[in-house]
């Protein structure tokens, strides 16, 4: 909990809900009480709405991961909270939490870690990010993307992630466009020559069409296109 406060994942204004029971029945009761508290507060029409942070210890989380009834309470509770902290958990439990959320929701999950104990979690998520640092390169080598420091995550997602999505989309659409353009002209020419098999282009022209004639626009768009500046993307995260 102290680390959550120090990294500002949990703020002083949040109400912290702690689940640290050892028995499955006690864990179920604690989760249900916390969920009732969060839902009751959300139902009250007052502003500003109180924010919650959920803290779950490893032995309680173990019951959640192996009991679907507990998972049915845990996930709605986690969705009502601004932050969820799982403490004193094993590397396997980290991966199982990701698998649980992945199985029960349609959201895209991102996992980030900096050590060997985060490898399973990183590989279980849709997108894995490894931080190369003092704890070695195991996480960075097993991840989809590697960064040097945690603070680079903001620019990686809001700027480079946004640009990459737009570049890939435009490149794919352009590839379809240039291919359709070529073969539609051949189709219309076939109507003109009564489908005799005569081609409208020389064989070398058709070979060079994708390799030379239409290659540069795809490369330029796929590498250099910036439909919005980096400063604007960081200033307005809603664009992400």
Predicted feature residues:
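N-terminal phosphate-binding loop and flanking beta/alpha elements of the actin-like ATPase fold
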Residues: 1
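Membrane-embedded transport module
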Residues: 5-110, 115, 119, 123-240
């Amino acid at each position: 909990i102290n680390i959550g406060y120090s990294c500002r994942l949990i703020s002083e204004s949040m109400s912290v809900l702690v689940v640290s029971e050892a028995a499955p029945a006690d864990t179920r009761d604690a989760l249900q009480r916390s969920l009732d508290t969060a839902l009751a507060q959300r139902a009250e029409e007052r502003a500003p709405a109180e924010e919650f942070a959920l803290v779950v210890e490893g032995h309680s989380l173990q019951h959640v991961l192996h009991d679907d009834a507990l998972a049915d309470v845990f996930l709605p509770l986690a969705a009502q909270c601004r932050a969820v902290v799982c403490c004193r958990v094993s590397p396997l439990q980290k991966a199982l939490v990701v698998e649980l959320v992945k199985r029960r929701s349609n959201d895209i999950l991102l996992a980030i870690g900096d050590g060997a104990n985060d490898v399973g979690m990183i590989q279980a998520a849709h997108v894995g990010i490894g931080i190369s640092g003092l704890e070695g390169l195991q996480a960075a080598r097993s991840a989809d993307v590697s960064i040097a420091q945690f603070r680079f995550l903001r620019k990686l997602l809001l700027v480079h992630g946004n640009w990459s999505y737009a570049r890939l989309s435009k490149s794919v659409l352009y590839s379809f466009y240039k291919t359709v353009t070529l073969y539609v002209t051949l189709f219309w020419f076939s109507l003109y020559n009564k489908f005799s098999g005569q081609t409208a282009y020389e064989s070398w022209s058709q070979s060079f069409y994708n390799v030379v004639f239409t290659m540069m626009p795809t490369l330029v768009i796929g590498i250099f296109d910036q439909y919005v500046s980096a400063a604007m993307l960081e200033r307005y995260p809603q664009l992400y």
